[in-house]
A protein has these predicted regions:
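N-terminal capping/interface segment
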Residues: 1-3, 55
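A generic fold-level signal
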Residues: 4, 99, 179-180
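Structural alpha/beta surface segment adjacent to cysteine/selenocysteine redox centers
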Residues: 24-127
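C-terminal cap of thioredoxin/glutaredoxin-like
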Residues: 11-12, 16, 23-32, 122-224
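Extreme N-terminal starter segment of soluble prokaryotic enzymes
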Residues: 4-10
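Residue-level recognition of the N-termini of beta-strands and the immediately preceding loop/turn
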Residues: 7, 38-40, 183
């Protein structure tokens, strides 16, 4: 018989995923509601991994229309400082890459693993509302201060190969879990048993109902 573990929600996301930004209020609400009953972890998916630095312009042209759909469906708002880059692709100096925000999250989770969902949400707010460049080391300083993480330690780790490898391990794990798009939410109940709870944006009521259904099934199995 397989080992029972504390049921764990894995939220697979990418810092640059606009739909994940729209999903942030849903997953943070779920994390708050199920605190103590479920464990939570966030895995970065490595959505943007250019072989060489690639300018934001092609992505910006897509976002010019797509962001409105995200706002309409989720109720989230993109900030003017972010949208400036979206609507001035010829002037922006952004070269998006998922690696650094993934490394930053790996470091932050090490200090406060129970806050992983909130940290991921804050990283996305920093980009999509405040318009911070997540490839710039300074984009993280306010979060390091907010979460009371030792600054020198954080920045040493941000430049280290060790934490880059941790981020790449998460990218590989997300692929191994057969995640093909973001956001994605999985619930692990045994060493090898996972339930897919969300693939793409999912509203709070739907996600909560799916979680409760799985938890009810687990409890039923354990009493039989």
């Amino acid at each position: 018989m397989e080992n029972k573990i504390q049921p764990t929600i894995y939220y697979c996301y990418d810092a640059y995923c606009g739909w994940c930004y729209g999903f942030s209020p849903v997953i943070t609400r779920i994390a708050k509601e199920y605190e103590g009953r479920l464990a939570f972890d966030v895995l970065s998916g490595g959505m943007i991994m250019p072989e060489e630095p690639t300018h934001f312009a092609p992505m910006a042209q897509y976002i010019q229309n797509a962001y409105k759909r995200v706002e309409e469906l989720t109720g989230i708002k993109f900030g003017q400082d972010f949208l400036w880059h979206v609507f001035h692709p010829e002037e922006t100096d952004w070269y998006p890459d998922s690696t650094k925000p993934a490394i930053a999250l790996c470091i932050m989770k090490e200090y406060y693993p129970e806050k992983a969902v909130y940290m991921a949400s804050d990283l996305q707010y920093a980009l999509n509302y405040e318009g911070r460049d997540l490839t710039d080391n300074e984009a993280y300083r306010h979060l390091v201060i907010q979460y009371q993480i030792p600054e020198e330690e954080f920045y040493t780790k941000l430049k280290s190969e060790e934490y880059k490898e941790k981020a790449y391990y998460e990218f590989a794990l997300v692929k191994q879990l057969q995640v093909t798009g973001f956001p994605c939410v999985l619930l692990q109940v045994t060493d090898s048993k996972f339930y897919l709870l969300a693939s793409g944006y999912t509203d709070y009521e739907t996600l909560k109902a799916r979680i409760d259904k799985v938890l009810s099934e687990i409890n039923k199995d354990s009493t039989e």
